[in-house]
């Protein structure tokens, strides 16, 4: 990294920009419930002497994710569904941050990825606000998995605006949720977060590869939104 840039950047692992950026993805989800700084730091400390070992990165994030997931499921079983859902949200994010560096994707990695998806889905059952739905958007004879997050409060006198999020290279819809979606829905803007071709579930389990003509898969996404009665299309 350029020396001047390094002075301006928070680099948890100064010798490895990629790992520092990956850990920052974890830390940056904290304001929206996707991480707890102490938990992320605990993972970072365990990795200090193994910088660059992507298998170790995966194992330590998965270890933390499983610990947090177990606590969340225990809370839910005890009737503390709000705190349980918070744990599951963080576990979902940790599973996905840990899996992102695995190339090629292994069965172990795909299993961890799906645990993250399951944690997010299970948390949604207990989160009353913002209200969200897991939806499937018809596309090329199959569908794109997505999360629709309702505007809060709903506009009783009219329709609401909406924003679409498509994932980046190695981001998932579950991670994207913890990147400010709650702030938008609190301002009365609905959000649709999509695992498009080449991302998330679409590439891992549906063989939908990245393509350059974004309009090909964006069009059915916007058609889906336009068909929702509460959206101002």
Residues covered by each model-derived region:
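Long, non-catalytic architectural segments outside compact domain cores
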Residues: 1-57
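Conserved alpha/beta-hydrolase
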Residues: 183-201
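An N-terminal hydrophobic leader/cap segment in hydrolases
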Residues: 29-42, 92-135
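Alpha/beta-hydrolase active-site loop
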Residues: 208-233
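N-terminal cap/lid segment of alpha/beta-hydrolase-fold proteins
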Residues: 59-61, 65-68, 111-158
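Amphipathic alpha-helical repeat scaffolds of TPR domains
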Residues: 59-70, 85, 89-98
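Active-site glycine-rich loops that stabilize anionic/oxyanionic intermediates
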Residues: 160, 165-172
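The serine-hydrolase catalytic nucleophile loop
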Residues: 169-182
